[in-house]
Amino acid sequence: MRIIMLGAPGAGKGTQAQFITERFEIPQISTGDMLRAAVKAESELGLQVKEVMASGGLVSDDIIIALIEERIQQPDCKNGFLLDGFPRTIPQAEALKDQGIAIDYVVEISVEDEEIVSRLSGRRVHEGSGRIYHVKYDPPKVEGKDDETGEALIQREDDKEETVRKRLKIYHEQTAPLVGFYQSWAEKAPADAPRYVRVEGVGSLDSIRDQILSQLK
């Protein structure tokens, strides 16, 4: 079971990816983790990554594809894998296709922008413990205060509405077109293309999980 997950930041990809990887006993392959592991291992690719990162540059798609090819040869990928955070753009998706890296399913978790803004901008955090609240869905007993310590809660920079909207804008410009790429591929060459699964990411975690798993055969 070889899977790519798509969805805007805050759509709930991480939680659902965990359900999928446990159900099918496959690893979740994060590009960030792969890059860090390659640098640590000081492999040939790792040294290239280290050089690029040290200069403040972006690691090329070619290097990331090579790392993915290397990673999916590992024994824990014998049942498949779930790609997290890649591809993000159409050129990356085309590179993955050109290298012949087979994908069985592309799973999109679809959530309206305003719902995502509400989810993320409503989060409040207790810095000392990392406890997370939500002003609407999981409020503290006393507004703005941690339940355990009574200390003030903060809103992280990443959760501020302006930041969330910027992240969504980037997602719609770069990653959302992948939906069309994979749908079009499935229409033109259904035998070769990954099967496209789209699920509304609103409702209970269990119901979203069940919708996804029912379509992954």
Curated annotation (Swiss-Prot):
<keyword id="KW-0808">Transferase</keyword>
<feature type="binding site">
    <location>
        <position position="167"/>
    </location>
    <ligand>
        <name>AMP</name>
    </ligand>
</feature>
<feature type="binding site">
    <location>
        <position position="31"/>
    </location>
    <ligand>
        <name>AMP</name>
    </ligand>
</feature>
<keyword id="KW-0418">Kinase</keyword>
<dbReference type="GO" id="GO:0044209">
    <property type="term" value="P:AMP salvage"/>
</dbReference>
<feature type="binding site">
    <location>
        <position position="123"/>
    </location>
    <ligand>
        <name>ATP</name>
    </ligand>
</feature>
<comment type="function">
    <text>Catalyzes the reversible transfer of the terminal phosphate group between ATP and AMP. Plays an important role in cellular energy homeostasis and in adenine nucleotide metabolism.</text>
</comment>
<dbReference type="InterPro" id="IPR033690">
    <property type="entry name" value="Adenylat_kinase_CS"/>
</dbReference>
<dbReference type="GO" id="GO:0005737">
    <property type="term" value="C:cytoplasm"/>
</dbReference>
<dbReference type="GO" id="GO:0005524">
    <property type="term" value="F:ATP binding"/>
</dbReference>
<keyword id="KW-0545">Nucleotide biosynthesis</keyword>
<keyword id="KW-0067">ATP-binding</keyword>
<keyword id="KW-0547">Nucleotide-binding</keyword>
<dbReference type="Pfam" id="PF00406">
    <property type="entry name" value="ADK"/>
</dbReference>
<feature type="binding site">
    <location>
        <begin position="57"/>
        <end position="59"/>
    </location>
    <ligand>
        <name>AMP</name>
    </ligand>
</feature>
<dbReference type="GO" id="GO:0004017">
    <property type="term" value="F:adenylate kinase activity"/>
</dbReference>
<dbReference type="InterPro" id="IPR000850">
    <property type="entry name" value="Adenylat/UMP-CMP_kin"/>
</dbReference>
<feature type="binding site">
    <location>
        <begin position="10"/>
        <end position="15"/>
    </location>
    <ligand>
        <name>ATP</name>
    </ligand>
</feature>
<feature type="binding site">
    <location>
        <begin position="85"/>
        <end position="88"/>
    </location>
    <ligand>
        <name>AMP</name>
    </ligand>
</feature>
<keyword id="KW-0963">Cytoplasm</keyword>
<feature type="binding site">
    <location>
        <position position="36"/>
    </location>
    <ligand>
        <name>AMP</name>
    </ligand>
</feature>
<comment type="subunit">
    <text>Monomer.</text>
</comment>
<dbReference type="InterPro" id="IPR006259">
    <property type="entry name" value="Adenyl_kin_sub"/>
</dbReference>
<feature type="binding site">
    <location>
        <position position="92"/>
    </location>
    <ligand>
        <name>AMP</name>
    </ligand>
</feature>
<feature type="binding site">
    <location>
        <position position="203"/>
    </location>
    <ligand>
        <name>ATP</name>
    </ligand>
</feature>
<comment type="pathway">
    <text>Purine metabolism; AMP biosynthesis via salvage pathway; AMP from ADP: step 1/1.</text>
</comment>
<protein>
    <recommendedName>
        <fullName>Adenylate kinase</fullName>
        <ecNumber>2.7.4.3</ecNumber>
    </recommendedName>
</protein>
<dbReference type="InterPro" id="IPR007862">
    <property type="entry name" value="Adenylate_kinase_lid-dom"/>
</dbReference>
<feature type="binding site">
    <location>
        <begin position="132"/>
        <end position="133"/>
    </location>
    <ligand>
        <name>ATP</name>
    </ligand>
</feature>
<feature type="region of interest" description="LID">
    <location>
        <begin position="122"/>
        <end position="159"/>
    </location>
</feature>
<feature type="binding site">
    <location>
        <position position="156"/>
    </location>
    <ligand>
        <name>AMP</name>
    </ligand>
</feature>
<feature type="region of interest" description="NMP">
    <location>
        <begin position="30"/>
        <end position="59"/>
    </location>
</feature>
<dbReference type="Pfam" id="PF05191">
    <property type="entry name" value="ADK_lid"/>
</dbReference>
<dbReference type="InterPro" id="IPR027417">
    <property type="entry name" value="P-loop_NTPase"/>
</dbReference>
<comment type="similarity">
    <text>Belongs to the adenylate kinase family.</text>
</comment>
